[in-house]
Amino acid sequence: MPKNTLHIKNIDIQTTHIMLKTDINCDIKPFIQNQREIILNEIKENPNFLKSYTPIPLIDKKPILKLMTKAGEIANTGPMAAVAGSISEMCLDYLESFKSKFSIVENGGDIALKTNKKINMGIYAGKTSFSYNYGFKIKPKPYKYGICTSSYDGPSKSFGSTDATIVFSKQSSIADSLATSIGNYGNGNTENEVVHNALSYAEKYSDYYEGVLVIKGETLGKTGHIPQLISINNTHVKEAFEIE
């Protein structure tokens, strides 16, 4: 796919920071604003939607609230653990409604994508040597695919100490909540112990993901099937994505 056929946008709305690459030329910002308003209105009506660290009952059945609540139920987290991944997933669904064949939606590191080309993407794992030096080669995904990351020093609350807990799933909403849940169990006295504990806990959710990769310091471990790990030398890949 020639790069000039892609529409590349950065959309910032308060705490939502979207990087978009898509073959669809449309103004998606009003859609994102609407999803945010739905979430904020729910928080006003039900403050526990924001505060809970455990699953809560669904009251309003708007699609994005259903995604967040379901993801929380699966991963045993509160719905806000899935907020970034759910916004990404809703944006991808919106682009798919226009027959998109290539779309990448990144929301603060939580990614929903559908591609007809291989792409390379970098890993960010704090101050470890893996950050910006290694990444993944993602095969074409003609269906929805989610890649979400949680870390102890990220913008969202984590009770674990992993530098990166990366989950690959068919839904970015679920990948997001699972990254939080699995990352919460990444604790221990050594790097190996942190990685082992997170991956051991991940096994109970194996029906909901394709693979999980955990990084602590200079130690890396994985379970399930993850994309091919690659060394990255291209500066562009370190900052975003490279299309093959």
From Swiss-Prot:
Disulfide bonds: none
InterPro entries to which the protein is assigned, alphabetical: ApbE-like_sf, MA1715-like, UPF0280
The family this protein is said to belong to: Belongs to the UPF0280 family.
NCBIfam families in the cross-refs: PRK04334.1-1
Annotated protein name in UniProt: UPF0280 protein Msp_1322
Species this protein is from: Methanosphaera stadtmanae (strain ATCC 43021 / DSM 3091 / JCM 11832 / MCB-3)
